[in-house]
Amino acid sequence: MSVKVSGGGVLAQVLRDGVHSDTTSAVIVVDVDGEHSIPSIAQLTDNQIDEIFEQPMQRVIAALQEAHEANCRRIVVVVPTTGMSGGACYAPQAALAESARILVKSAARQWGSTGITVNAVAVEPHWFAIDPSISGPVAIAPRSLSNEVSPVGVITWLCSEASQDVTGQTIVCDGGLWM
């Protein structure tokens, strides 16, 4: 069964190519803009807040609504771990990622009684072009896994019937970078 993947960038394409499901599913890659860092929260403008936070958050809400209207049984929202740890010069991006994770929990509570699961997957910041030399590390230790980490397997499982008992959760899939 096909999985509808919304969002742009390399990660969304990797997920379109690799994620499959045995039930109607949607994957929402949050449009976190890691290309534009903000030197200081004090310098953040209304236009930047609108472009980096508000518009992408509206797209997450719309994608969740579309998935619900399409009777998706599994919904997965993908964010960077930067939201969980914060990131110097990436405050609006971190706020967007955390807002999306809170929305996941709320949707899971609302829709769970109808058999819909809603979860988040937090991946390495590089998938969103977030520069760790600017944001600072998300951990005080190096990653525990040395291979390149793909979230395809975790997201495929969350889109399956086998994951029916997991909802409202964030699964970290970053090779042990954020613990």
Residue spans of the language-model regions?
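Short, well-ordered coil/turn residues at beta-beta hairpins
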Residues: 29-35, 174
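Canonical Rossmann dinucleotide-binding motif of NAD(H)/NADP(H)-dependent dehydrogenases/reductases
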Residues: 1-23
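Catalytic loop of short-chain dehydrogenase/reductase
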Residues: 32-33, 40-59, 68-113, 122-128
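Residues immediately C-terminal
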Residues: 178
